[in-house]
């Protein structure tokens, strides 16, 4: 089946699909104060989704393209679940978030198919993949249209990988007690086996969101990157997120001696947001297998255990948490009780001495991850490093932080 035919098959014009903002039915919804963070964007008035401009631009989306798609959504007069929220248009039609971003992606997909130059075609495929992935954002369980967009994002990513520098291998890893999981191994030019970073992404992201991280930071240093979807989404959708949050990554880590392209004696883990929960767990549970663990804006204790901090978090992010935990009908109180069990401090890990070198970067006044969170991680390590990242200029400081973190990882892997 061609890519175009797949698009037509998946997105048949139907209007009965459940609208994204209604998938999680928490009972205590309320208005929240304005909030902004470097890694998550901000909760803009009249939008259900957080608008994550920094990360979308970092992944290669032109700011004007973001505004163009937003404008089409705003201008739609189609029926909405909530008339006060622009991105709640019901059904796959003009004005619907998934429709408009997927339509934008299809334009780039068409350009990719028509482009003769392999490298340029690869760039267009990668861009299409990014846009399909934004269409599927925030990847809530049971969102049929989003899952279809995600399938197209993965397909476009595979097409891009065939044309871009280095090589990418799609790998399947067995996990006892359930379905195998699919990971992507990104390898730089040269002969392996390569030192490798195991990427642990955030709960509202997919494994294909981190190509920029590989291309700009890891590949130039000769480091490979292995990505894996978090439990309950993407290729790991058959696995529920549990208090043993590192389960899937742990099984992949244990299997690396059998992967000929990976130097299993030189492996580090890198965690964004809740991915740091996974990475830090691995630092404790699999210390002999890891040379280092780096975290950025970690979610390992404060947000999971502090009701006051949870009350400042946007509705969409709480919905993401509830969706990942399989608590689609839960009250905020029930969600808080469950989240507390995911705190690595409550689990008795953080605070104990850890032999694995750990770095953690934070932004001051980050609503998701206070300075104390990163400090708790680095002081628990026998070789800890704390990085404060100034907020403005946000893009330049984000780049500087990633360069510093990559240098630190590279030093530990050499």
From Swiss-Prot:
Gene3D superfamilies: alpha/beta hydrolase. GO terms for molecular function: carboxylesterase activity. The keyword Hydrolase applies. It is an enzyme of class 3 (hydrolase). Pfam families: FrsA-like. It catalyses: a carboxylic ester + H2O = an alcohol + a carboxylate + H(+). The keyword Hydrolase applies. Keywords: Hydrolase, Serine esterase. Its EC number is 3.1.1.1. InterPro entries: AB_hydrolase_fold, FrsA, FrsA-like, FrsA_esterase. Belongs to the FrsA family. Catalyzes the hydrolysis of esters. This is Esterase FrsA.
């Amino acid at each position: 089946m061609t890519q175009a035919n797949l698009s037509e098959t998946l997105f048949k014009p139907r209007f009965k699909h459940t609208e994204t903002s209604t998938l999680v039915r928490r009972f205590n919804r309320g208005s929240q104060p304005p909030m902004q963070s470097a890694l998550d964007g901000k909760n803009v008035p009249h939008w259900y989704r957080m608008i994550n401009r920094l990360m979308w631009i970092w992944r290669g989306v032109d700011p004007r393209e973001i505004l163009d798609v937003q404008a089409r959504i705003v201008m739609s007069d189609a029926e909405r679940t909530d008339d006060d929220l622009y991105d709640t248009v019901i059904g796959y039609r003009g004005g619907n978030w998934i429709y408009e971003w997927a339509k934008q992606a299809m334009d780039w997909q068409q350009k990719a198919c028509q482009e003769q130059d392999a490298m340029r075609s690869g760039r267009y495929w990668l861009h299409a993949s990014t846009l399909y992935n934004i269409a599927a954002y925030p990847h809530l369980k049971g969102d049929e249209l989003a899952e279809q967009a995600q399938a197209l994002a993965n397909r476009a990513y595979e097409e891009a990988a065939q044309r871009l520098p280095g090589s990418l291998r799609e790998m399947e890893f067995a996990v006892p007690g359930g379905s195998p999981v699919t990971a992507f191994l990104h390898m730089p030019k040269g002969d392996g086996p390569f030192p490798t970073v195991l990427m642990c992404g955030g709960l509202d992201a997919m494994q294909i969101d981190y190509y920029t991280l590989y291309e700009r930071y890891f590949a130039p240093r000769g480091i490979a990157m292995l990505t894996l979807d978090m439990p309950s989404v993407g290729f790991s959708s058959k696995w529920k997120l549990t208090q043993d949050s590192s389960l899937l990554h742990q099984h992949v880590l244990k299997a690396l001696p059998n992967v000929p392209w990976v130097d299993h004696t030189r492996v580090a883990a890198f965690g964004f947001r809740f991915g740091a929960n996974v990475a830090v767990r691995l630092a404790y549970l699999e210390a002999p297998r890891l040379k280092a663990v780096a975290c950025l804006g970690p979610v390992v204790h404060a947000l999971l255990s502090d009701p006051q901090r949870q009350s400042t978090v946007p509705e969409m992010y709480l919905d993401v948490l509830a969706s990942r935990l399989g608590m689609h009908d839960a009250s905020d109180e029930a969600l808080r009780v469950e989240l507390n069990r995911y705190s690595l401090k409550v689990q008795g890990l953080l605070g104990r001495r850890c032999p694995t070198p750990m770095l953690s970067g934070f932004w001051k006044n980050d609503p998701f991850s206070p300075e104390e969170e990163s400090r708790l991680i680095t002081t628990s390590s026998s070789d800890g490093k704390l990085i404060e990242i100034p907020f403005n200029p946000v893009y330049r400081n984000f780049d500087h932080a990633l360069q510093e973190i990559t240098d630190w990882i590279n030093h530990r892997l050499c």
